[in-house]
């Protein structure tokens, strides 16, 4: 098991592993902290977590959904200790075809805690320069993540932009002294891709077992009126934005490029994000299956299996 998280992250709720099987395929696993081992349904802790709903991350501190003893210790999937987890384990070919999937309650022991920068350095290493099994595992995961990402985008998943910044604070006054853009790397996309795959896989699993009682997450198709301003602005620069479906929107955004203004496309994607309908949690029995889809991810079903420590 390997952890890939930001530097200093303490509430670690996911790990990844990738093992080469005797038949040449890969065993790929996403393991998520088993919060239910410590929090019983209907308990005082469960009710308090429900009222908070999520952990809140401020510039200089974090307001936890669950007590710190759980979030940063007992439930946190830290390296070199045993932890309770739920695992989704796939058998995947080197070409990215999923052969089968299994779901298990597990006890995991993470052997490496990597920052995104460290994971990126593994990805960037030439294949011939390292025999380290951790490097090999991360490189295989990166290769699969690229394949899965391409499949999602080809199916119509959107690649939008949301500017992220981090503040540097004065150690005494806590006043901001600098603001820096947060740089996303391929290692970030690697983790994101497998979390999305886990959430989609679990959504399908719970629907098979609880067809009318599954808690899912839907993203309705946007209303055209919400996009009118953006469509008008893009048309002024000679581009047509098509929102008939997510694939057409993705293709029209990809085509809206100005060599003289390299940030034009990113600006369009930021504005597109603001035109979207909000995603919603819902019970599968409340909507028709055609209304379960997640527009932004181009996924017929989706849920939030990951991040149980913080939501």
Q: Residue locations for each model-derived region?
A:
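Electropositive polyanion-binding surfaces
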Residues: 1-311
């Amino acid at each position: 098991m390997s952890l890939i998280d930001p530097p200093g992250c303490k509430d670690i709720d996911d790990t990844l592993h990738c093992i080469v099987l005797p038949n040449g395929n890969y065993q790929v696993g996403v393991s998520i902290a088993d919060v239910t081992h410590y929090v019983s349904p209907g308990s005082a802790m469960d009710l308090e977590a429900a009222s908070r709903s999520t952990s809140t991350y401020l510039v200089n501190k974090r307001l936890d959904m669950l007590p710190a003893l759980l979030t940063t210790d007992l439930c946190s999937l830290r390296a070199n200790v045993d932890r309770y987890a739920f695992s989704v384990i796939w058998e995947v070919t080197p070409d990215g075809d999923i052969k089968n999937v299994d779901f298990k309650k597990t006890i995991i022991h993470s052997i490496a805690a990597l920052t995104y920068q460290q994971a990126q350095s593994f990805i960037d290493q030439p294949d011939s320069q390292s025999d380290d099994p951790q490097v090999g595992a991360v490189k295989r995961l990166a290769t699969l993540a690229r394949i899965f990402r391409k499949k999602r985008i080809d199916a119509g998943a959107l690649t939008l932009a949301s500017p992220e910044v981090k503040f540097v604070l004065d150690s005494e006054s806590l006043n901001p002294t600098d603001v820096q853009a947060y740089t996303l790397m391929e290692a970030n996309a690697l983790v994101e891709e497998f979390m999305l795959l886990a959430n989609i896989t679990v959504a399908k699993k719970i629907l098979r077992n609880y067809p009318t009682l599954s808690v899912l997450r839907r993203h309705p198709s946007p209303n055209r009126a919400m996009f009118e301003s953006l469509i008008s602005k893009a048309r002024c620069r000679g581009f047509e934005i098509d929102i008939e479906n997510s694939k057409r929107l993705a293709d029209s955004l990809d085509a809206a490029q100005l060599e003289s203004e390299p940030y034009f496309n990113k600006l369009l994607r930021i504005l597109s994000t603001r035109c979207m309908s909000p995603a919603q949690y819902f019970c599968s029995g409340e909507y028709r299956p055609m209304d379960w889809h997640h527009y932004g991810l181009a996924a017929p079903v989706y849920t939030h299996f990951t991040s149980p420590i913080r939501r």
